[in-house]
Structure formats: structure tokens, C-alpha cells
């Protein structure tokens, strides 16, 4: 756990943040907006400020709050310092997988989902399960697709779910629209088994690259992720 956050601002490039806010304003959804992984709440501040106070839809945040010390209180203060009241936000301090099971049991639905949590392929795959609770016509955003675990999970998700179409792809921000409901879950047991099997292999690759960097003074060239 870090002692302090790296930044209180949104951890997106200027172009990514601009595109995210534009799509939120363009759609102007009235249903629940979900953020999975909030860090210090910088992106959350920006998303909430895209709405007037009187027109702001419900916001839900899923995060175990173990990224740095006193994370939840730092998030709340960051929101207040940016003129946004944290009191109306539904903070669910738990892992994404646990929160999904509860939300599914409660038959919740969402208009907008922004995923920027842990970047390991198994965690991203679990986060993408939330697409099951996204309404038809809703938007799902996935950040940091240049990270191998995120990119591989995104590739597989898109291959298996053609009813999700790309609306925008800015830098490492992938914006998808759910065009119809599906009889089958977006993420199957096979998908989760694939991700769980792949995760330790990717960790080994990272470890090996670090050893090579230490030996050679630089990282070896790494190919862009390819679908598995």
C-alpha cells in the first residue's frame, strides 16, 4: 500500500479526459453511473462535474480502498475541494467481484460504466462482468488498454461480445456502446478460467523483463499484445 496517492487529479491524458467528459455530456444518461477503481477520485470529480448539481445522476464507486493509506477520506476531501459533495455517492468498499454478485442479486442496472481498476488480466476480466448489468444503449469505458493485461482482456471481450461496438478509441481509452441485450453473460466461466491461467504467466513475463533490464540496462523489445 502506498503512503500517499501519486496524484489527486484524473489519471488520464488530456485527450482521454476530454473524450470521456464529452461522451458523458452527449449521452446525458439519467441512470446510475459506475466507476470501478477510483484512485484519489480525480476522474470521479471530473465525471460528476460534467453535470449540473440539479441534473446529476446517481454515482456508484467500487473500490476496496487499499491503494494507499486513508484512501476513502482522501477521496472525500478531494471531491469537496473540487466543489463536489461526496455525500451523495454510493461508495462500496469491496472488491469488484464481490460487489458484482451483490448488484446482480439486487437486479441493479447502469447506464454508464468506467473501468480503471487493477490492471492484471484476471481482475480486468472480472471487472468486465459488469457489462451484464449495463442497459442497452449504455456506455462502457475501459482505460489503460496499452497495459498488456488490460489489452488482452479487452481483445477477448470484443471478440466474444460483438453487440458491443467501439464509439471512440482515444489514446488508451476504449469507449464501447452496448447495442443489444445478450442471452449469455458477457464473461463466461471459460473466460475467467482463461484469465486466471494467463495472469501468473504475465507476472512471470514482467519479472523476467525486470531481470533482463537489470542485466542489460534496458527492457527487451516487447511486441504489442496479441489475442490468445
Regions from the language model: what does each represent?
Residues 3-10, 17-228:
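S-adenosylmethionine/decaboxylated-SAM
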Amino acid at each position: 500500500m502506498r503512503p500517499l496517492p501519486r496524484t489527486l487529479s484524473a489519471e488520464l491524458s488530456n485527450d482521454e479526459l476530454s473524450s470521456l467528459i464529452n461522451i458523458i455530456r452527449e449521452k446525458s444518461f439519467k441512470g446510475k453511473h459506475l466507476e470501478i477503481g477510483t484512485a484519489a477520485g480525480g476522474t470521479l470529480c471530473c465525471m460528476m462535474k460534467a453535470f449540473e448539481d440539479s441534473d446529476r445522476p446517481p454515482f456508484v464507486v467500487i473500490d476496496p480502498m487499499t491503494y494507499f493509506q486513508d484512501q476513502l477520506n482522501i477521496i472525500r476531501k478531494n471531491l469537496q475541494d473540487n466543489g463536489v459533495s461526496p455525500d451523495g455517492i454510493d461508495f462500496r468498499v469491496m472488491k469488484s467481484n464481490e460487489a458484482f454478485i451483490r448488484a446482480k442479486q439486487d437486479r441493479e442496472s447502469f447506464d454508464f460504466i468506467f473501468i480503471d481498476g487493477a490492471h492484471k488480466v484476471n481482475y480486468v476480466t472480472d471487472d468486465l462482468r459488469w457489462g451484464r448489468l449495463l442497459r442497452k444503449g449504455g456506455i462502457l469505458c475501459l482505460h489503460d488498454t496499452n497495459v498488456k493485461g488490460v489489452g488482452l482482456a479487452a481483445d477477448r471481450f470484443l471478440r466474444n461480445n460483438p453487440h458491443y461496438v467501439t464509439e471512440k478509441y482515444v489514446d488508451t481509452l476504449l469507449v464501447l456502446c452496448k447495442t443489444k441485450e445478450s442471452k449469455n453473460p458477457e464473461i463466461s466461466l471459460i473466460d475467467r478460467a482463461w484469465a486466471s491461467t494467463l495472469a501468473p504467466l504475465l507476472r512471470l513475463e514482467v519479472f523476467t523483463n525486470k531481470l533482463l533490464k537489470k542485466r542489460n540496462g534496458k527492457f527487451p523489445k516487447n511486441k504489442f499484445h496479441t489475442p490468445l
